[in-house]
Swiss-Prot record:
Induction: By chlorohydroquinone, hydroquinone, and 2,5-dichlorohydroquinone. Binds 1 Fe(2+) ion. Its EC number is 1.13.11.66. PROSITE patterns: VOC. The gene is linE. Keywords: Aromatic hydrocarbons catabolism, Detoxification, Dioxygenase, Iron, Metal-binding, Oxidoreductase, Plasmid, Repeat. It comes from Sphingobium indicum (strain DSM 16413 / CCM 7287 / MTCC 6362 / UT26 / NBRC 101211 / UT26S) (Sphingobium japonicum). Changing H229A: Loss of catalytic activity. Changing E278A: Loss of catalytic activity. This is Chlorohydroquinone/hydroquinone 1,2-dioxygenase. One of its GO terms (molecular function) is metal ion binding. Belongs to the extradiol ring-cleavage dioxygenase family. GO terms for biological process: catabolic process; response to toxic substance.
Length: 321
């Protein structure tokens, strides 16, 4: 199969269906030290829910964890194969003992220190909805500047994504897609894990695949406790269009049209492994809020400004930071 030009640059954002907005703030902001950079709404369905964006100071690609807290809307699903099963953050070398103690103090059940691909890490789950997380020790050179959080000292702060892990029943077809269509390069194996990287790897440029032949498939619909999609960065709309054209030419035709998401432009493709991938062009978060005010107000489409308060009352999912 023909290999395409290297158009995909790295991890952009991850989008997760969670339980409650406050549960997300308690974990992402008050425990992991991320900034709530944007509060918007998701309107598909009978009841609106928040769409929350967490990251570093300006929400750079490679730091963005976005959530749909869907519990009150009644969206349910099942975790399993064909989904992203863990989101891993970078932490400075030598800080895992601090993070382990900190997570325990915050009533988060956390693993002992483990090792994979020669790197030490901790694993834990979102206390409110069960989504998987990891914190991986890595040299801070070339990593993202962390948000100056009042909850986490800067010297131990998380510095964007290290990697994401997809759980699959088998990897043959997904391996071909990632190498030939998504320009990921195999980096080796560690047990049931296969590592891939964009370019030479580094911060937010790694994707792991965990093979579990016995894991039952997860659901694809938006449901609490599941990663909905994994978004990857492309440079601009022309590159995005060329990527779609060429990937469809390889036979991967389950692509969406371009979607304007307010803060990025997106196209989506269902991969052979079942994971929903997005190719995302960054527009940024400061066109409707100043850098100092990011995340301070709920932003809605202009045509909905007149009913925003009513939507918030209907949602009934308060946030206290």
């Amino acid at each position: 199969m023909m290999q395409l030009p290297e158009r995909v640059e790295g991890l952009h954002h991850i989008t997760v269906a969670t339980g409650s907005a406050q549960g997300d703030v308690d974990l992402l902001v008050k425990t992991l030290g991320q900034r709530l950079v944007k509060k918007t709404m998701f309107y598909d369905g009978a009841r609106p829910v928040y769409h929350l964006y967490f990251g570093n100071e300006l929400g750079e690609p490679g730091t963005l964890y976005t959530t749909f807290p869907v519990r009150q809307a009644g969206y349910t699903g099942k975790r399993g194969a064909g989904q992203i099963s863990a989101v891993s953050y970078n932490a400075p070398v030598g800080t895992l003992s601090w993070w382990q103690e900190h997570l325990i103090k915050r009533a988060v059940t956390v693993s002992e220190v483990r090792e994979r691909f020669g790197q030490k890490y901790l694993s834990f789950e979102h206390p409110d909805c069960g989504v998987g997380f990891e914190i991986i020790e890595q040299d801070t050179d070339g990593q993202f500047e962390p948000w100056d959080s009042p909850y986490v000292p800067k010297e131990v702060a998380l510095r964007g994504f290290h990697s994401w892990t997809a759980t699959l029943n088998r990897n043959e077809e997904m391996d071909s897609f990632m190498r030939n269509a998504w320009n990921l390069k195999p980096q080796g194996r560690d047990g049931n894990y296969q590592r891939y990287a964009f370019g030479n790897g580094g911060a937010a440029k790694v994707l792991d695949v965990y093979i579990d032949e016995d894991e039952r498939p997860g659901t694809w619909a938006l449901g609490e406790g599941q990663v909905h999609h994994a978004a990857f960065e492309v440079a601009d709309l022309d590159v995005q269009a060329a990527l779609k054209f060429d990937v469809e030419g390889l036979g991967y035709t389950d692509f969406s049209d371009r979607k304007h998401r307010g803060y990025f432009e997106s196209i989506y493709v269902r991969t052979p492994g079942g994971v929903l991938f997005e190719a995302s062009v960054t527009l940024g978060f400061t066109h409707d809020e100043s850098p100092e005010k990011l995340g301070s107000e709920v932003k809605v489409a202009p045509q909905l400004e007149g009913v925003k308060d009513e939507l918030l009352r209907t949602m009934n999912d308060p946030i206290v930071i």
